[in-house]
Amino acid sequence: MTVKVQISGTLKEYSRQSSEINISALNVGAALEALQSEYPSLYNCVCDETGRVRRHLNLFVNCDLVPIQNTNGFDTLLHSGDVLTIWQAVSGG
């Protein structure tokens, strides 16, 4: 099933300047695997060397936060037309 991945901010430079990517995936883990094969530089910005999502990023499916602190979040199901958003946390002083 096809889902839309929305890329925020500076991560666009790793997605060939696209703010949206269409991929085929059944769950969040499969979506990340698709990113790894199609956009390896983007994947490396999103996930660390162990495959976990980096701490300064959040993933949302249709505006619902994905619990990526544990690997169960990778099992979050995706349906055709869903939107997976990769959101980069911003902070300052």
Positions of PLM-derived features:
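Ubiquitin-like/PB1-type beta-grasp interaction modules and other compact soluble beta-rich domains
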Residues: 1-92
